[in-house]
Amino acid sequence: LNTFAVPEGAFTTLHVKAKDVDKYIELMKKNTAPFEAIGSDLAGVCVTKTGHQYPGEMFVWNAFPSVEKAFAATDLYDPMKASGPYKNMRKVKYSSTFKPLKEFNLQPAYERLWRLNLNNPMAYTQKMIELEEAIRAAGHNMNIGVFQPLGGGTEVFHVRAVSQSASELGKVVDDYFAGSSWSKIWDESAQYVDEIVSDTIEHCLSLIHI
């Protein structure tokens, strides 16, 4: 029995291979027209720091108040048809929409991302709610998100553990291996995971507040 309500809102992601990550981010900061065109509430980027599938791996994300708005955005801007500097700065890999399955405090920073095949998404999400509460009670400022792909092709569930610094992210891992009281919740959640598709660390930040 689920004891939580699925929140409103959705995110879109555009996964790219950037020729120069820093220059691409600066370009987006200066040219906000694509973000304004699709009507997102907030936009940003996540740059893969470890566990890359290819050099320059990153994605652009947009937050929307509903799945309706997120889906509608696909008709308002086509990244495959981008011209000018955007076309020259990155190669589009794929895009997706994600629905958060639990409340998620959006504070982009240093994030460990697991891409998972889940056999019981709602039961897993319940465990992540318990885990987040326990980790915070242990003194860590961590946000955990569980996101279901919608129209994402072969994309799988995304689970994000977010800390405000890379060292703090590592400190949580140290606590797990030291046998912290909350570690058993993480271990119990494994029964709902059929496969860990990938495990990466990303640096995420907000770019645009619309």
Please name every model-derived segment:
Residues 4-8:
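Boundary of Sec targeting at the N-terminus
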Residues 11, 15, 24-28:
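An N-terminus-focused feature that recognizes amino-terminal "leader" regions
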Residues 12-16, 59-65, 113, 158-162:
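Solvent-exposed beta-strand motifs enriched in subsets of small alpha/beta binding domains
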Residues 13-14, 100-145, 151, 158:
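Surface-exposed interaction/gating patches
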Residues 18-25, 64, 118-125, 163-164:
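Soluble non-cytosolic domains of exported or imported proteins
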Residues 26-46, 51-54, 63-97, 130-144, ...:
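An amphipathic, aromatic/His-enriched active-site/gating alpha helix that lines ligand/cofactor pockets
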Residues 53-58, 153-157:
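A short, glycine/Asx- and small/polar-enriched loop/turn
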Residues 208-210:
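Conserved small/polar residues in nucleotide/adenosyl-binding loops
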